[in-house]
């Protein structure tokens, strides 16, 4: 075995291991070795390579890697195909910025073809950084053969899906109000909108709509979007709701009866009450009357009107509201558009022409006030949708779009979702399920440039549509020869003209590109160019056993995968979804570069190592919980877990090499109870870890392993050190080596999916083979000893209580104490005699015994809890307090047992006192200190005799010399002669404990003499000791 370089940095170790993996093709071997095995399928959600990875990506990649590595070691074949999401507006915006242009008009002036070429060049801007990040974090995924959404084979598969959907009659062209980004100048789908809501304060207005042919009668309508008022064509009431005409300051206002108090506040008189249906067809004068409105400006009935807020009357602007549009269509009212594609007013609103509508609310309100049409204005806080790509506020805007009739197969969506296991479970019928329940048809088209072209050709003469499902299909119907290398992007596909099979007319492609979420949702099929190629491979890799991405993908990729698959095949594309929580800063705030609180995962890997980062992300909390995260979290993972394990591994290698121990040779071994215990813990942990991983409970699995590693380091190795230090090779020492070797090899397999680098380093050095080509550990039931584990757990509890006791009373462990008394509060069959020596040695006490009668060593004190007792006992409180103080110890003990006592007041009143009213304090017998955990109480005799004090000094000296040896980098097995120069009192103490010193310090000879200032000095409290070590001959 190679010596472990404890000074090697984590990054140095990981770089060395990565090089080994690459040279020996370990990743490739791990897949090849499972050829013919059952497949376990996971899909890689495609990131965009025109942005840098963040710490959320580190969590996602870690989780996916843990799953893939574990399932591979569990015997499955796990293909891991990387992917790149390369289309869409973020790419376009980046290119616009690079070119110094802005907006669709300037793009078209620049030229669509050169613009498309620039987009294609830019999509892999950060591919190198993504590859380096992916490799550095240890995520094994095939980045040499990824699926790429811009490539022709991928797009052709997407076309086949869309063509099939069109064939089923589910793709249609419609005019409707859709969420619209005026900055990007394109509409969005409902699941895109769901990703960008923000809480904002907008100016709201209660507007006066004058009833026609009346002197002073007004409908009051409330709106949070005053900018839509110029497009008003109607007012809506609920036909069955009651409305009042109320007089206030000489005016008559019409509002919902339920809202009159909230709207008019005070000083009003209700004149009459009317059903909403009575108000229908009442005409009014619009605040911005438009001559284009030939049928409108009257009250209509609508079921969506409520009295939850506002006035109970809704102002209807059909161009800018989904409900408004539907009701106007059904009523046959006029349609009014006063805003252009940039979100600016047209000449229809002369005084605001060219102004962005969301910046115009104040202008509109001022105009209303000036015209005497403003009843009230106020700031209103509400959730408003913003563009998930550019952060601009969205408008609801009427226009022509291509839509997929998802609502027609809503039941399929819901049934498919019912078969999926969600982590966390509440997502299934909560956030995701509710989104499916409220789904609308998918707005699939985008009026942009860089994306998969919508494969629909329309006839100029008869409106017939043709949706080719392949390049061959398009070529077959083309009116002229199509280039062999036709690129499936604008403007190239736009040049392909098709002949109408119905009338022979010319057909041109509709100019839109598709929603990028449809691209990524098609990946189960398109990654293998299905159905054109790889049919068997696709069938083997569909559906996914699991997918894992951030919670923000709930209405993104998780939805688009489900939707595309349901529309195309009717089948569910995944069996399980791991919805990962956000990684927040240590204050619980979302990380962002603008706030300066974002952590760079590459920096974290370079500083602490990938194993530490991965472990920190896994062990802190379940991955679907939002987690507070910081450099400190990663540092703790490194020091508490990775470094602890490396230290144990280093200890084993060091002593095994010194003793020339060879695990492949046969030795006479005699396993101790400690060996049996650690092997039982190893296999019970293996059992728990496998169970947890099979249920995707990564944090539970990691914590089980962390507990085991801590026990191996701080209990097994520490309690076994004397065996490793002994000369020669006896049966118990051989057992210690054999046991620790088995423990380390098995732990390296257990942690391989979690911390792949340190696992590989340990396994490779101890066995000569890669851990990632091994099977995951299985439980050896014959080694499980639950009773032994329970007993050792009790011992550990007592030792921990003893240490805590010493800490609380400033008694160093090196200072021997006379006695430890253990009080057991619950009867059990624990054989403490078998563990007497361990407890005495660990806690450095000279005697140990178990006592069932705790009254011999403790008593109780009762103090009144005035905070709760004061209000309860009133005038009796002081008398109760005095009574408590004079209770006998038997009476106090009875109160502690029964948890109640009765005080008879001077008035004869009986006052019941319970544990809620009293603070119970356990007091140790004089000369003892106590610490308890409810199950056990540890009593330590704190009287330190002169003899004990002297031994404590000797043990402190041993500790100081051991530290000094480490500073000199002396071999651990080197015996030395020691010369000391110190005061006479310390000389005498050390002489009296010469045997103890020689046993613990590998010292052959101790002598005292005069040393010069050039020799080194040790500090024992305030005492200085000069020391000189020399190797024995």
Swiss-Prot record:
Its EC number is 6.1.1.5. Transmembrane segments: none annotated. One of its GO terms (cellular component) is cytoplasm. Pfam families: Anticodon_1, DUF5915, tRNA-synt_1. Keywords: Aminoacyl-tRNA synthetase, ATP-binding, Cytoplasm, Ligase, Metal-binding, Nucleotide-binding, Protein biosynthesis, Zinc. It catalyses: tRNA(Ile) + L-isoleucine + ATP = L-isoleucyl-tRNA(Ile) + AMP + diphosphate. InterPro entries: aa-tRNA-synth_I_CS, aa-tRNA-synth_Ia, Anticodon_Ile_ABEc, Ile-tRNA-ligase, Ile-tRNA-ligase_type2, M/V/L/I-tRNA-synth_anticd-bd, Rossmann-like_a/b/a_fold, tRNAsynth_Ia_anticodon-bd. A motif ('HIGH' region) lies at residues 47-57. It is an enzyme of class 6 (ligase). GO terms for molecular function: aminoacyl-tRNA deacylase activity; ATP binding; isoleucine-tRNA ligase activity; tRNA binding; zinc ion binding. A motif ('KMSKS' region) lies at residues 590-594. PROSITE patterns: AA_TRNA_LIGASE_I. ATP binds at residue 593. Its cofactor is Zn(2+). Its main location: cytoplasm. GO terms for biological process: isoleucyl-tRNA aminoacylation. It is found in: Cytoplasm. IleRS has two distinct active sites: one for aminoacylation and one for editing. The misactivated valine is translocated from the active site to the editing site, which sterically excludes the correctly activated isoleucine. The single editing site contains two valyl binding pockets, one specific for each substrate (Val-AMP or Val-tRNA(Ile)). Catalyzes the attachment of isoleucine to tRNA(Ile). As IleRS can inadvertently accommodate and process structurally similar amino acids such as valine, to avoid such errors it has two additional distinct tRNA(Ile)-dependent editing activities. One activity is designated as 'pretransfer' editing and involves the hydrolysis of activated Val-AMP. The other activity is designated 'posttransfer' editing and involves deacylation of mischarged Val-tRNA(Ile). Belongs to the class-I aminoacyl-tRNA synthetase family. IleS type 2 subfamily. Monomer. This is Isoleucine--tRNA ligase 2.
